[in-house]
Amino acid sequence: GVDSTVSAILLKQQGFDVIGVMLKLWAEEGFNRENQCCSIEAANQAHRIATKIDIPFYLLDAVEPFYKAVVQPFISSYLSGETPNPCAWCNPLVRWKQLLLYADAMNADYVATGHYVRTIKDAEGFVHLFRGMDSQKDQSYVISRLSQDQLQRSIFPVGDYFKSQVRKISAEYHLPYSE
């Protein structure tokens, strides 16, 4: 989406070598609703935008780890009368795990996402998580379960921006979702 794309743009401006990676989390053939995070159209759009901003793009298959770590526990929790939050499980157990494995394979030092959070490393090297600058878009809750090792290797470029600023940067690059 716009937040991930602008994160890539900001990192390129800072001199990072950037690649685009999207996780395929769902295998159901009929799951192709427009503007859904895992749809074929979303993957195609991500590839087109990566090409437009001149970064390589990779689609990683994470269907099995997602099903085991998120879907099965979600179903069990729901059937037990709980109200599960799949994002809280997905980020540390699937998204970051898979992205960091791929980063290691690509000899990449960091993983960056378009989440609206901020981090600060203290003098002892401990990474502290803070709310994003835009309180309306803050996503610290869904990032809060990341391990210290995962946070050490994570960058959140849009955490210091308001959504309106992110959309303005997107518009400067004539991206399709800048409104």
Model-derived features with residue positions:
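Rossmann-like dinucleotide/flavin-binding elements
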Residues: 170
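Active-site and glycan-interaction determinants of carbohydrate-active enzymes
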Residues: 173
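Short gly/Ser/Thr-rich phosphate-binding loop of adenylate-forming enzymes
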Residues: 161
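Catalytic core of tubulin tyrosine ligase-like
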Residues: 167, 176-179
